[in-house]
Structures are given as C-alpha cells and as structure tokens.
Amino acid sequence: MNSETLPAELPATLTIASRESRLAMWQAEHVRDALRKLYPACDVKILGMTTRGDQILDRTLSKVGGKGLFVKELESALADGRADLAVHSLKDVPMVLPEGFALAAVMSREDPRDAFVSNDYASLDALPAGAVVGTSSLRREAMLRARHPRLDVRPLRGNLDTRLAKLDRGDYAAIILAAAGLKRLGLAARIRALLDVDDSLPAAGQGALGIEIAARRADVAAWLAPLHDHASALAVEAERAVSRALGGSCEVPLAAHAVWRGGELHLTGSVSTTDGARVLAAHAHARAATAADALALGRRVSDALERQGARAIVDALVAASAQAQKGGA
C-alpha cells in the first residue's frame, strides 16, 4: 500500500480488544502486526480482557448463555471507546451481532477442519470401545455419537492449553479441536489426524478471524479494509447465513462449510439431534460475487434443511436449553 491509498486522518493509536488466552492473544497480535506493517506511524496496542466465557468452565456453553459470553466484554470496550476494534475467532461470534456493532473485516482463512488429538491413538477408528473423547461443542458431540456410538463422549471446557493438559494427564483418550488454533500456536505436531469435512462438517466461520467494530466507526472500517479477504468473507457469510436462518447457536449441533471450486462457492449445511440419531444435510453451489450472493446461497441451504425438518429439531433443542438454563439459575 502506498501513501496515495492510505486512509486519511490515521490515528496516533489504535487499540485492539482481545480475550487473554494464548490463542486469542496470538490472533490479536497477528492483526496488530499486520496493522503496524500497513501503518508504521500508528501505535497499535492490545487490551487483554477476561470474558464470562473464560470464567465459566464447569458447564457447557449451551447451558450458560452461548457464544455471546466470549464477546460481550469486548463489545463493551468498543462501545465506550476503550478499544477501536476487537478480534474474534468467527466460530465464537453470535450469528446476529447486537445493534451498534459491525463485522468490518474477515482475514484470510486458516484450515477450517476439526483435528483428532491423542497421545496413544492414531485416529477415531483406532479408539477402543468405551474410550473417553472430549469435545467442547454439541456439533462435534453429535458427530461423534452418530459416527462412533461405541465411544464415551464427554464435555471439555477451557482454553486450548487447558484442554491439551487434560488430555496429557489422562482425563481423555482423545480430544477433538479446531485445527486452526493448533496450527496458529505452532502445535500442528499434536494433530494425529485431520477429520475430513464429510465426516465432521465444521462450524460456521471455523478457521476464520473476524474483526468487529462499533458500527459508528466508519474511520476504523476504512483502516481495516486492506486486511479484508473477499473470498474468505463470502464463504463465511454463506455459512453464517445458514446458521442465522435456522436460529443456530451453541444449543444446536449445526454445521456449515463453504469452499471455492471452479469459480463457484459450494456450501454444505447440517443439523442434527444431540444424540446423533438424526442428521440432516443439504448442499448448494453458485457463483458468488457479493455478500448478497453469499446470503442467498446460505438461504438456499437453510431452506432445504427446513424442508427436511430442521426447524423442529432446532426449536426443540433451543427450548430444552432454555429450560436447563432456567433450572440452573
């Protein structure tokens, strides 16, 4: 980028809000370094924050309020001016942002697949019957129960290092993690196998970094524009459109994955019951040049899932989750 294309009125300082986990800080530092390279005269800082999602580790997200627990404190910092932007793993961002906030940039995507991690076994198929497998999401839990019913699937909370420590001390025979996080932290060697998307369809936005801002900050949006990867953003928008249309959240084993092939965006969506007894899937593809195109593609897939009965599954799971939260209040 040359001086003629730089946004006007660059600030003296830009502050990035981030969770304080090692992975979250890596992501914030990745954005910070990119901004420093673009704007060397600007002092880019990171404001580390602890979110409620980081603090509540004894219950699954579906029972304590969902993905918004990881972003609310960061959004408060955006709203009151303590931070100019917030960096998120997009799979942790609610499908509908609160009023007054916007997703300003999606960076080039890392590997969206799930990873099988174990100290003793090479793959899910190699695990003996009754082996304990840990996962942090209902989506992965449903996948495991559907494809590997002989395994003992149990919840696994905590940041990436905590989850690996629980595996290493013998609490689990294996755990399922996002490949992107392991690769970003230089832990790719811990991956024993990458799960094919046909076997474990990723969460919407998995592997992508999103940068959120206060919607009123058009200036920040302009400064972030060079970081935006259009192809990744369209894929993520299509995926999130599936989940958004169905009311997807942590209460629902819902997956969506889009990939570019031959100039077209190919999108697959899936909804299942938590026990894996019923799995619905739909696929569509189209040429997508704009966010509206990606949204339309997502709606085609969500409509196809609804015709198969996805709405009844989603509504039942959301109602059950609400009852569980009420009972635990």
Curated annotation (Swiss-Prot):
Reactions the enzyme catalyzes: 4 porphobilinogen + H2O = hydroxymethylbilane + 4 NH4(+)
Pathway info: Porphyrin-containing compound metabolism; protoporphyrin-IX biosynthesis; coproporphyrinogen-III from 5-aminolevulinate: step 2/4
E.C. no: 2.5.1.61
Record organism: Burkholderia pseudomallei (strain 668)
Gene Ontology CC annotation, any one: cytoplasm
Entry keywords, A to Z: Porphyrin biosynthesis, Transferase
Binding partners and assembly: Monomer.
GO molecular function: hydroxymethylbilane synthase activity
Transferase in keyword set: yes
Name recorded for this polypeptide: Porphobilinogen deaminase
Family of the protein in this entry: Belongs to the HMBS family.
Cofactor(s) listed: dipyrromethane
Modified residues (S-(dipyrrolylmethanemethyl)cysteine): 250
Additional remarks: The porphobilinogen subunits are added to the dipyrromethane group.
Gene (name only): hemC
Taxonomic lineage of the native organism: Bacteria, Pseudomonadati, Pseudomonadota, Betaproteobacteria, Burkholderiales
Entry-linked NCBIfam families: hemC (TIGR00212)
Purpose of the protein: Tetrapolymerization of the monopyrrole PBG into the hydroxymethylbilane pre-uroporphyrinogen in several discrete steps.
